[in-house]
Curated annotation (Swiss-Prot):
It comes from Ralstonia nicotianae (strain ATCC BAA-1114 / GMI1000). This is Acylphosphatase 1. Belongs to the acylphosphatase family. One of its GO terms (molecular function) is acylphosphatase activity. It is an enzyme of class 3 (hydrolase). InterPro entries: Acylphosphatase, Acylphosphatase-like_dom, Acylphosphatase-like_dom_sf.
Length: 102
């Protein structure tokens, strides 16, 4: 994402994934997928057994990332996903990382 038009097109979404998504390497796989797609932000487990992710990137990048989150990895069983668009202005992320459980 190097051009001014790319920066202007940035989208940020907060995603909550429910189902069997903890204790199976879902967050680690999420970090790998996000980095491969060029998505920045973070992912963390929640105490309610869900996984929460803040995603930032171009619309097509976030569509691909949300599709992956909804399907998950082979060991996951995604039962539901909530996506919230974060209105601008929003903080800029420079990488994708795994955060501690909240």
């Amino acid at each position: 994402m190097g051009t001014a038009s790319d920066a202007a097109a940035l989208v940020t979404r907060l995603v909550r994934v429910r189902g069997r998504v903890q204790g199976i390497g879902y967050r680690e796989a999420c970090v790998r997928r996000a980095r491969a797609l060029g998505v920045t932000g973070w992912v963390r487990n929640r105490m309610d057994a869900s996984v929460e992710a803040m995603l930032q990137g171009l619309p097509l990048q976030l569509e691909a990332m949300c599709a992956w989150l909804d399907e998950g990895m082979p060991a996951a069983l995604v039962e539901g996903m909530e996506v919230i668009e974060v209105p601008a202005p929003f903080p800029r992320f420079d990488r994708f990382e795994q955060l501690p459980t909240l």
